Structure formats: structure tokens, C-alpha cells
Amino acid sequence: MRKFSLRDMKKVTLGKALFAFISSENMGLKKKSQRKEMKIHFTNLFGQSSKSVALMAQNDIMNVVRELGVNELGIYFYDHSNEPASELNSRMDGILAGVAFGDIVFVQSPSWNGIEWDRRLVDKLKLLQTKLVMFIHDVPPLMFESNYYLMPNYIDMYNQSDLVVVPSEQMYHRLVSEGLTVKKYVVQKLWDLTHSLDLYTPQFEKKLIFSGNPSRFPHIIDWKYETPLHVYTEPVEGVDYSKVHIEGWRTKQELLLELSKGGFGLVWGNSENPEDERDYYKENISYKLSTYLSAGLPVVVPDYLSNADYIREKGLGFVASSLEEANRLVQDCTEEEYAQMVRKAQYTSYLIRNGYFTKKLFVDTIMALGE
């Protein structure tokens, strides 16, 4: 049997070392050649009532972008007033577990867990060096006068983003006047309300329809116009509904089917007199409006609504300066005029039902982030 010499042993050792070196170099080349794929994430709200418009709006957005390959970051609405800092930190780490350095994150704002909670989440996202998009649904300091003192905190949070998605041009300029410094922005214009229901074709009826709780709209309960008003809401004990037709509460699917039968969907602010209306309703966009349009229903809106020009330009209904004028416009409408509005509303209904306003703002945002 041949014996191995010291020279043979050195050859074997050198060969192993060379093989190990070549292998490690190849692995390094593979790692360098494999670029990490950037992911896009959206926060999404859970834990509120199924009747909550805030929850429905965020969930509707998520349903659309999920089809585009977006990852969901679920945020639960809860009372965190007594939550220890360490537990909150762990909770947020869990929410953001799938987010990597350099990813794009859309924060649907607010989470309704309070500004401090939201700011802490944003701080964590900034540590991950994400491209941060603040998708502003509502601005609590502008919604409620009692919360206006929180405005600097919200502006501070918004200013950490790379781009803001705002409901309207009016809202962007209002936020700039409050101290917003983010230059890149995308306008949402309308909410999407996706569904695949086989709806009716709206028929001409001289009636107005109001969907939602009228408790914040005393002029709805105290209706005093010729055109009958049908209100879809859960009746509250002790409230006099004798001046309106109460239709009860409906699920989303039931409501859309009922709306598509005909009439005009009414969108109005908290005040009967437009001069008394707070600016917020003029800067935000109405989920109620998209509900009507999703059903293919012509609408009646106030002239101060942020997207009133869209309704006027597309011929989707009437734009009125008062409820008295709204009543007159409906009463003077002809069957031919109504049929023309329905035809035009069908196109916008298609866009809303299939999520095109969300898809457009999504693409516009991604493109703008790369500029």
C-alpha cells in the first residue's frame, strides 16, 4: 500500500482550500447578483363596527390594491391607554415584520388609535428607511374643532412622508397653509366601492335618497320640501321621522340594489345653509357620493363639495346652491334628462365598481416616488 508523504498531504490541503475559496467566491457572486425585490405595503384597519365608514373605506382600498400584489399591514383599533411601552413596541414590530429596508409603505391615515400611536408607527417606518406615503383619509383636527390643538402633531407626522395622497386639491392647499412641506402629492378625487352585483337600471322618479345616520344632519330630519326624501338608516327611538320616509338600515349589497332602482342620491353637509358649512366638508370627499355613483344613481350635491366640478362636468346629476334649489331641480327634471344622466353615471359607476380611482392614484404615486 502506498504511503502518503508530507508533500501529498500538502497537495490535499491546498486543494481543499482552493475549492473552498472558489466556492465562497461563487456564492458571493450569486448573492451580489440577486437584488432584493422591493415590496409595497398598505396599512389596513380592523376592529371597528362593520357599519364604520372609516373601516369600510380602508378595507375597500385594500381590496383593490391587493390585486396589484400589495402586502397588507393589519392594524387593529383598540384601547391602548394602559398598554405598556414594551408591549406596544412588540405589537408594532409584529405589524411591520414583513417590511424590509427600502420598501414602499402606504399608511392609511388615521388609524383612529390616536396621534401618538400613529407617530410611533411612522417613526419605526422611518428607521427602516422606507419610502413613506401618507394616504390621508381624514384629518381629525379639521374634522372636530375640539381637536384642532393637535394640528401641529399631525403636520409633523405628515412631513415625515415622501408623498401625500390627499382627497382634493383644496385639502392639499389647506394642509400647506397649516405647515405641510411635502412637495409631492396625488389627488384621490373619488372613493372606490367595489362590487360585482347585477344591479337595476335606475328609473325616473322625483324622489331624493339619503344614506346614513341623519343625527348630524337636522335639516334631513326636518325635511320641508315637496320632493319626498327616503332615508336609509337604523331608526333611533325618540326621534321624529314623520317628515321623511325611513327605509331602515341595509347591508352594502342590499343598499346598492335598492339605490339602483331610481331617484336621486342626496349629498349635503351638516348645515342646511351652505354659508354655515364648515370648511372640512369642502376639502374632504364623500364616501356617500361614491355609494350612489357605484349604484349608477344620478346625484344632487352642494356647489361647495370638493368634487362638485366633476359631477357638473361629467353630467352625473345636479349641483345646487341650496336645498330649495335642489328640490326645484328635481321637480323640473324630465324623464329624458334623467335617462341621459343615468347613461353618463353608468361609466363612472364602472370605474368605481372596478377600483379604477384607487388603481390610478396607486400608479401615479409609484411613478412620482421615482421622479
Where are these regions (language model features)?
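A short acidic/histidine/glycine-rich donor-binding loop in glycosyltransferase catalytic cores
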Residues: 314-320
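Nucleotide-sugar-dependent
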Residues: 253, 257-295, 301-309
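A charged, aromatic-enriched C-terminal amphipathic alpha-helix characteristic of glycosyltransferases
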Residues: 321-328, 335-371
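Donor nucleotide-sugar binding/catalytic pocket of nucleotide-sugar-dependent glycosyltransferases
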Residues: 162-176, 181-197
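Extended catalytic core of nucleotide-activated donor transferases of GT-like folds
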Residues: 82-173
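Conserved catalytic-core segment of nucleotide-activated headgroup transferases in glycan assembly
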Residues: 191-260
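N-terminal subdomain of nucleotide-sugar transferases
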Residues: 2-79
